[in-house]
From Swiss-Prot:
Subcellular location, record wording: Cytoplasm
UniProt xrefs under Pfam families: EFP, EFP_N, Elong-fact-P_C
Recorded metabolic or biological pathway in which this protein acts: Protein biosynthesis; polypeptide chain elongation
Xref: InterPro entries: Elong-fact-P_C, NA-bd_OB-fold, Rib_uL2_dom2, Transl_elong_fac_P/YeiP, Transl_elong_KOW-like, Transl_elong_P/YeiP_cen, Transl_elong_P/YeiP_CS, Transl_elongation_fac_P
Record PTM text: May be beta-lysylated on the epsilon-amino group of Lys-34 by the combined action of EpmA and EpmB, and then hydroxylated on the C5 position of the same residue by EpmC (if this protein is present). Lysylation is critical for the stimulatory effect of EF-P on peptide-bond formation. The lysylation moiety may extend toward the peptidyltransferase center and stabilize the terminal 3-CCA end of the tRNA. Hydroxylation of the C5 position on Lys-34 may allow additional potential stabilizing hydrogen-bond interactions with the P-tRNA.
GO cellular component: cytoplasm
Stated role: Involved in peptide bond synthesis. Alleviates ribosome stalling that occurs when 3 or more consecutive Pro residues or the sequence PPG is present in a protein, possibly by augmenting the peptidyl transferase activity of the ribosome. Modification of Lys-34 is required for alleviation.
Family named by the database record: Belongs to the elongation factor P family.
MF (Gene Ontology): translation elongation factor activity
Record-given protein name: Elongation factor P
GO annotation, biological process: peptide biosynthetic process
Sorted UniProt keywords: Cytoplasm, Elongation factor, Hydroxylation, Protein biosynthesis
Superkingdom of origin organism: Bacteria
Amino acid sequence: MANISTSEMRSGSKVMVDGDPCAIIDNEHVKPGKGQAFNRIKLRNLKTGRVWERTFKSGDTLETADVMDTDMEYLYTDGEFWHFMAVDGSFEQHAADETAVGDTIKWLKEQEKYVVTLYNGAPLAVAAPNFIELEVKETDPGVKGDTANGGSKPAFLVTGAMVRVPLFINIGEVLRVDTRTGEYVSRATGK
C-alpha cells in the first residue's frame, strides 16, 4: 500500500490506523510558539464508527486504506442483512449488516442507488444520495386554508422516516427530502 504524509491528508482521505481503516474528518496543522509543528487529526473508524482525535508529528506518514466507494443499487432486506447490487454491469451483490447501514436505514428505497464503502470486499458503510424522493404513508389531512399561517406537521414516509412537512401535504404524495438533514425540500416533480 502507498503511504500518505500528514500534510497531504484531506477530509475524506482513507488511512490505516492501528490496523483499522479510518476516514479523516478534519486535519488541523498546529505550529506552537515553541517546539515542533504537528497535525491534530480527527478520525472516524470505518468498522466501528468511533470518532476520536490523534496527534501526529508534522511529516509523519500513514498507510492508505484499501477501501473503495462503489455505486450500488439497494435490492431488499431479509431482516438481518440489507442486500445491494453493483450497477457497473458485474451484477456483484453484497450484504451489509446493521452497523454498515447505520442511520441510512430510514432512507433505503428499493431500486435506488447508494454509495457502499467496501473494505476487503465487505461493506463497511452505506451512504444515501443527498436527495431522495419518497411517498408519504401517514400524516394528518390537509385542510383548505392551512397554508396561510405557514405551519408544519409530521409525516411518516414509506421507509419509516419522519419528516416535518407543510400543512398542505397529503397521504400518497411523493416528496423530495434532503437525507443529510432529514428535511422536506419540495414535492417531487413528474409524479
